[in-house]
Amino acid sequence: THTFNAGDPDCLAAVRETTQGGVEFAFEMAGSAKAMELAYKITRRGGTTVTAGLSHPNALFSVPHVGIVAEERTIKGSYLGSAVPRRDIPRFIEWYQAGRLPVKRLLSEHLVLADINAAFDRLAQGQGVRQIVQFP
């Protein structure tokens, strides 16, 4: 897993170089039309762009129609991870307890509530991407 700064003018080139032509899956989580367009651009032929960020109800994004068809790309929406909490949360707990859900590998940081402001600063700098906040 890699993290790239979408605001970097060389982001698209960096992703394509790192992934040898684009990613198989791109996830847009910010609810930004600009981020959605970039997420689409970084996918390779046959790739899937998933958007889960909620934007303004009238927000639009633009992608070339021919790319969807000729490059066989998919754009998919996901609300709350397409999860059904009553069904899925017990399943996730079971997987975690059985060692099948490597939560610790997915974390960039574990912190206490008192450190929340510093954590937001790190998040804004792209350093703390997946954080768990422990409440007292």
Regions found by a protein language model. Give the residues of each.
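Adenosine-nucleotide cofactor-binding segment
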Residues: 1-38
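Hydrophobic packing within well-folded, soluble alpha/beta domains
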Residues: 3, 26, 43, 49, ...
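Broad hydrophobic/π-residue packing in well-ordered secondary structure
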Residues: 3-6, 11, 52, 70, ...
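Glycine- and other small-residue-rich loops at beta-strand/loop junctions that grip anionic moieties
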Residues: 4, 24-28, 52-54, 78-81, ...
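Poly-acidic low-complexity segments
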Residues: 5, 10, 62-64, 102
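C-terminal hydrophobic helical "lid"/dimerization subdomain
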Residues: 9, 17, 21, 37-41, ...
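Glycine-rich phosphate-binding loop and adjacent beta-alpha segment
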Residues: 33-100, 135-136
